Amino acid sequence: MIDKKEVIAFFDHCAPKWDEELVRNDAVIDRILDNADVGPGCHVLDVACGTGVLFSDYLKRTVASVTAVDISPQMARIAREKAKGTQIRVICGDVELLHFDRFFDCCMVYNAFPHFPDSGRLIQVLAGTLRPGGRLSIAHGMSRDKINAHHKGAANR
């Protein structure tokens, strides 16, 4: 079972270098956002937003709003800096304990799903955040083996 306290400690430790070590594939991200129907006027819930790696992508698509949530205080701090002066609101907290009643057009879980201890519960909670016709998008840019190797290396730095 994944311990949320360990997840917080790990990502707090990694936060300062996260963006410089991030490997982005813009074409893949564009496809993910296209498939999720993220576009003009859309209200997005960005779950486990990290340092805000998708913020610029949302802004390019002229979304109406983004509510970004991360459980790591250090990740959320960096994300808040990136969000200043935009329609992005960053919340530091456990998304499973927050209440958003059917407000969002899209709920995006990018590069984070394996870090949640109860995936079924998470999906149930996130489904309740969506308006009728809204989309829950769960995507990861790396395989499980690559994710584990990446995190093992990051933890040892």
What positions do the PLM features span?
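A conserved beta-strand element that flanks and buttresses the S-adenosyl-L-methionine
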Residues: 108
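Short catalytic micro-motifs in class I SAM-dependent methyltransferases
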Residues: 111-112
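A short glycine-rich, Lys/Arg-flanked "PGG" loop and its adjoining helix->strand segment in the class I
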Residues: 120-132
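Short glycine-centered segments of the SAM/dcSAM-binding site in methyltransferase folds
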Residues: 43, 134-135
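Class I SAM-dependent methyltransferase SAM/SAH-binding core
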Residues: 45, 51-97
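Conserved class I S-adenosyl-L-methionine
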Residues: 1-39, 53-57, 137-157
